[in-house]
Structure formats: structure tokens, C-alpha cells
Amino acid sequence: MDKSKRPFRKSKRSFRRRLPPIGSGDRIDYRNMSLISRFISEQGKILSRRVNRLTLKQQRLITIAIKQARILSSLPFLNNEKQFERTESTPRTAGPKTRNK
């Protein structure tokens, strides 16, 4: 049989469908911190819908719940520990500057 006339065959590989990240019994609410924290990055940013594998409606509800939790200070706006680390200061060589008149 000629290559151009040969029918196209797709290899049939078995695949395991991933479980949805949110079950039917899970309530998307700002008080449900164990659920909300799964959809936040290490830096405290809301992960995208593609990364979360959520539907559009679920992503919207998660986003609203995260924002409510941030406003009520259940969640930090930023999760940056390095911001508060104190660096060793260098001593000043010159004394206080004086203005000449």
C-alpha cells in the first residue's frame, strides 16, 4: 500500500483520568482554609485555572473566597518571609552632614 493512501491510525494508549481537585461535597467558602490554601502559590498568589484544573465557575468562586479571606486577614496578601528578614547594616563612615552657610 502506498504511504499516502494508508489510513491514519492513532495509537490507543490507556490513560487515567485525574480526580477533580474539588469534590461535590466541598463548599467553596472563605472559612474553608484547607480548600483555599490548595489554590494559592508559595508566594501567596492565586494560581491560574489551567494549573488548578477547575471549571470557570469554580475558579471564580475560589478567587472570591481567597479575596474575602485576605480582607478578613485569614490569609496574607503576600507570603514573602524574606521581606521581614533584617540584613546586617554597614556602619557609616562619615558623621552627620552639616550644611555650610
UniProtKB/Swiss-Prot annotation:
Keywords: Chloroplast, Plastid, Ribonucleoprotein, Ribosomal protein, RNA-binding, rRNA-binding. GO terms for cellular component: chloroplast; mitochondrial small ribosomal subunit. InterPro entries: Ribosomal_bS18 (IPR001648), Ribosomal_bS18_CS (IPR018275), Ribosomal_bS18_sf (IPR036870). It is found in: Plastid, Chloroplast. GO terms for molecular function: small ribosomal subunit rRNA binding; structural constituent of ribosome. Residues 1-23, 82-101 are annotated as: Disordered. This is Small ribosomal subunit protein bS18c. It comes from Drimys granadensis. The gene is rps18.
